[in-house]
């Protein structure tokens, strides 16, 4: 698992009780299952097949539990992962969980960028970032897909199977209140009643900046930089 910070907001939002697990028996107890990012998608996918977690996730999906994937988790949710250049290992084709009609092709070029987007059909402006290897496309070429995120430049990210199952390359997607409200929908919780994590982070940055100003001679640093 990588990018633990994707889930910090869930630890602070009172609507959710977050727990991490690699045990199959714990998966079925959850109302929402999130497959996180990883630096070794294929190896970790093989690991969850071996320990029974993959089967438990598929069973939860069939029981209409909410299942979402972020980055590597999104790749796992597809039909298969192809690695013709053996970027991640010797295996060139690995079966995915089959929850989303997608195919991922691993590449040795890494995508790294910040993104502004709109989630589903909501009007709220959202922010996140991408850091991944590989491209993910519909299983059948030319197939119309239901886009999850529409980026500011008009490009798209992610796939939405229905209200309860989607995947995205977007890290930080849960930091956006509209996404958390959507995630909590159906559980009898009022929208907008959660924790504003983005505002919380800004306050923490301001506090940190204040401490740095107290401890560091910024005027001297600026003078040496000719600012």
Role assignments for model-derived ranges:
Residues 26-27, 98, 109-111, 193-198:
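Interdomain boundary/hinge elements
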